[in-house]
Curated annotation (Swiss-Prot):
Pathway: Cofactor biosynthesis; adenosylcobalamin biosynthesis. Its main location: membrane. It comes from Haloquadratum walsbyi (strain DSM 16790 / HBSQ001). InterPro entries: CbiM, CbiM/NikMN. Forms an energy-coupling factor (ECF) transporter complex composed of an ATP-binding protein (A component, CbiO), a transmembrane protein (T component, CbiQ) and 2 possible substrate-capture proteins (S components, CbiM and CbiN) of unknown stoichimetry. The gene is cbiM. The keyword Cell membrane applies. Belongs to the CbiM family. One of its GO terms (biological process) is cobalamin biosynthetic process. It is found in: Cell membrane. This is Putative cobalt transport protein CbiM. Keywords: Cell membrane, Cobalamin biosynthesis, Cobalt, Cobalt transport, Ion transport, Membrane, Transmembrane, Transmembrane helix, Transport.
C-alpha cells in the first residue's frame, strides 16, 4: 500500500502529513515512556520494527502508484497499542522511503495514516473487544487481519480522494471502490496469511514466559 513518491497531489500530501504528525509525536513520547519504565522493552520494540520492516518490504505490484504486501503492524499494535505503533511504523516507512525507494517522503504522511494509524487502531479495537471471549492467538489473528485489510481500505480511499472519477463525493467513492477491488485480489489472502503468522509469533512469545511480555499485559 506504499503510495510512491510524488504520486499524490501536493494538497493531499500536505493534508495527510498534518493529520499524521501529532499522533506520531505522541507515539514517540509513549515509546520513550515505556522504554524508560522497563529497558528490556527496547529489544521488543526493535524486534517489532524489524517484523514490520521485513513483512512490509515483501511487495507485489498492484494499483498504479502503490503496492500490495503484508503490513506487520497488527502484531505490533497487540504488543504496544496504537500510539507506539504509529511511531514505529513511521520509522519503518521513513527508512524504506529513503533507502529502498519504497513509498516516498511526500507521501509519508498518507502511508503513516493508513499503515501506522487507522489500520492498527481498527485492529487494536477489535482485539480489545474480542480478547475476553477468545484465546490470545485467535484475538491476535483477527486483529492482524483487520489491521491489514483496513490499511488497504484507507489507501483506496486516499487514492480515490486524490484521483476521483469526476466531481463530488460519489466520484470519490466510485474511484476508491475501483482501487479497493484491485487490492482485494491480492490482499484478502495476504491478510489471512499475515494473521496466521502474527498469531504464531504472539503465541511463541508468550510461551517463553517473558516478564517483559507480561508487563505489557498482552497475555492478560
Amino acid at each position: 500500500m506504499h503510495i510512491m513518491e510524488g504520486f499524490l497531489p501536493p494538497r493531499w500530501a500536505a493534508a495527510w502529513t498534518l493529520a499524521a504528525a501529532p499522533i506520531v509525536v505522541y507515539g514517540a513520547k509513549q515509546t520513550i515512556d515505556i522504554i524508560r519504565q522497563d529497558a528490556r522493552v527496547k529489544a521488543l520494540v526493535a524486534i517489532g520494527i524489524a517484523f514490520v520492516f521485513i513483512l512490509s518490504a515483501l511487495k507485489f505490484p498492484s494499483v498504479t502508484g502503490s503496492t500490495s504486501h503484508p503490513t506487520g503492524t497488527g502484531l505490533l499494535v497487540v504488543l504496544f497499542g496504537p500510539a507506539v505503533t504509529a511511531f514505529t511504523a513511521t520509522i519503518v516507512l521513513l527508512y524504506q522511503a529513503l533507502l529502498l525507494a519504497h513509498g516516498g517522503i511526500t507521501t509519508l504522511g498518507a502511508n503513516v495514516v493508513a499503515m501506522g494509524i487507522i489500520g492498527p487502531t481498527v485492529g487494536w479495537t477489535a482485539y480489545q473487544i474480542i480478547r475476553p471471549y477468545t484465546s490470545l492467538e485467535r484475538a491476535t489473528f483477527i486483529a492482524a487481519v483487520l489491521t491489514d485489510w483496513t490499511t488497504y481500505l484507507v489507501t483506496s480511499l486516499q487514492l480515490g480522494a486524490a484521483f476521483p472519477a469526476g466531481d463530488g463525493l460519489d466520484a470519490i467513492i466510485i474511484s476508491a471502490l475501483d482501487f479497493a477491488a484491485i487490492f482485494t485480489l491480492t490482499q484478502v489472502p495476504i491478510g489471512i496469511l499475515e494473521g496466521i503468522l502474527a498469531a504464531a509469533v504472539i503465541g511463541y512469545l508468550t510461551r517463553l514466559g517473558s516478564e517483559t511480555i507480561e508487563s505489557l499485559e498482552v497475555a492478560a
